[in-house]
Amino acid sequence: MSKKVFFDTGIFFDCLESQDKKTLINHAINRKYHIFTSLLVIGEIILIMKRDAKFAEYLTGFFSLLSEWKITILVPNDGVAVICYDFSQDLTDGRMISQKTDRTHLAYATAYDCDYFITSDDALIRYKIPRRLNESDYVKPETLPLEAFKKLVMS
């Protein structure tokens, strides 16, 4: 059975800069992990790349990854809206209050029932979704850094 893996913004940059990390993702895909991301992640990547002199080169590489890995691009739905709203009302984790974009990335992965959320953001890894969402049967994907995902893929 295929596992759904959502990539946060930084993971794409890691893969663009490291052949070893690209190879890891190729192994994951060969082992039935399916890669997902969102329109918001793509937009954030483009905004970050625009600040760099190598914009065209990076953008070409990024779009090549989207195609090569057959990444599913998620769009907003009612579940994303509900989760984003509940995240915005949750003031229990002070690290996440100002992190609207990061919370939205996690909302996409949660709404679309992704099994894993891969990120380099420690606050997202430790973040506990509001109890109200758990009671509504939303489940936070297992949230891991790329190194932990590597151990999972290679096991």
Model regions: which residues?
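Active-site neighborhoods of divalent-metal-dependent phosphate/nucleic-acid chemistry enzymes
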Residues: T72-R126
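Short, hinge-like loop/turn segments at secondary-structure boundaries
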Residues: D52-A56, L91-T92, L133-D137
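Short, conserved catalytic or adaptor-binding loops enriched in Gly and charged residues
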Residues: N26-I29, F62-E68, L133-S136
